[in-house]
């Protein structure tokens, strides 16, 4: 196939928190590179996932959920999400098909768009009765003239291939933007930290996960092929430290075991993971700390 017919471009994935944006990206790539949990605001950074084949390269840009920001870290997350609304070739606006249509939010996003917007109706497997889906689609059709409305289930994979095909058709012709053998331009240490943070979100409750961050302090491959990783889970309060460690260290061990399994799948090798917990009071409001962690 000639280079002139090769397609490549940037596609942003935006939407409210907890609508399934990160699950969608992981499903498209066939690999977990983004932290996922049932708690909103799990994603904090702009994350690029790269899907390449013989005909095209799609650079998906996953963003933090757009929400009302009350803390410095939340403001940084929303700023990051809105930054990628411009300068891309296509936008995928992901909404939860089971939730009420947010007219003001949809109109606001569409008015700021600098590229065509495809509406992605996620969680269609949870819509009951199934006939209700037609009513949902009609509601969004009245709001904005979307070139495409694609019902999907990121969890089950339903209609994902159709979505990717439609995205690919829209891309401009051009050369690949990244090497064709990578899934993301993020360093492995970042993804490892994300996988650990995901387990904190999944296994702890209330405000605890929102005041945590993970820093990978050491990442080294030994002669026997084993990868040794030391990581620190930062929290804002002593009480949170106690919750994450758990009685007799049970919770920290559980976080470590589940994270290690995901990291081993990611790296394709055995992993030795050692976790520490450190208190950094009000780190979510400290500009220098947020910048160091890559949130600003």
UniProtKB/Swiss-Prot annotation:
One of its GO terms (cellular component) is cytosol. It is found in: Cytoplasm; Cell inner membrane. Residues 15-22 are annotated as: G1. Pfam families: KH_2, MMR_HSR1. Belongs to the TRAFAC class TrmE-Era-EngA-EngB-Septin-like GTPase superfamily. Era GTPase family. Monomer. This is GTPase Era. The lineage of its organism: Bacteria, Pseudomonadati, Thermodesulfobacteriota, Desulfuromonadia, Geobacterales. The gene is era.
């Amino acid at each position: 196939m000639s280079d002139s017919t090769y397609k490549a471009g940037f596609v942003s994935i935006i939407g409210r928190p907890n609508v399934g944006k990160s699950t969608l990206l992981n499903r498209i790539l066939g690999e977990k590179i983004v932290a996922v949990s049932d708690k909103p605001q799990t994603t904090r950074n702009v994350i690029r996932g790269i899907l390449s084949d013989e005909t095209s390269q799609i650079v998906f840009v996953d963003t933090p959920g757009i929400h009302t920001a009350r803390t410095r870290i939340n403001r940084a997350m929303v700023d990051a999400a809105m930054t990628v609304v411009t300068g891309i070739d296509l936008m995928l606006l992901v909404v939860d098909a089971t939730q009420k249509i947010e007219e003001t939010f949809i109109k606001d996003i569409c008015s700021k768009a600098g590229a065509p917007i495809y509406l992605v109706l996620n969680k269609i497997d949870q819509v009951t009765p199934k006939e209700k889906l037609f009513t949902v689609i009609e509601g969004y059709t009245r709001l904005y003239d979307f070139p495409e409305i694609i019902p999907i289930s990121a969890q089950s994979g339903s209609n994902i291939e159709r979505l990717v095909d439609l995205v690919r058709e829209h891309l401009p012709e051009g050369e690949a933007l990244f090497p064709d053998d990578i899934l993301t331009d993020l360093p492995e240490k970042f993804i490892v930290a994300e996988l650990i943070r995901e387990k904190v979100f999944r296994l702890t409750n209330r405000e605890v996960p929102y005041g945590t961050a993970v820093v990978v302090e050491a990442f080294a491959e030994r002669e026997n092929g084993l990868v040794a990783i030391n990581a620190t889970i930062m929290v804002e309060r002593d009480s949170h430290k106690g919750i994450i460690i758990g009685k007799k260290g049970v919770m920290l061990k559980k976080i470590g075991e589940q994270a290690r399994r995901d990291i081993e799948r990611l790296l394709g090798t055995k992993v030795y993971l050692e976790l520490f917990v450190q208190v950094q009071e009000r780190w979510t409001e400290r500009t220098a700390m947020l910048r160091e962690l890559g949130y600003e």
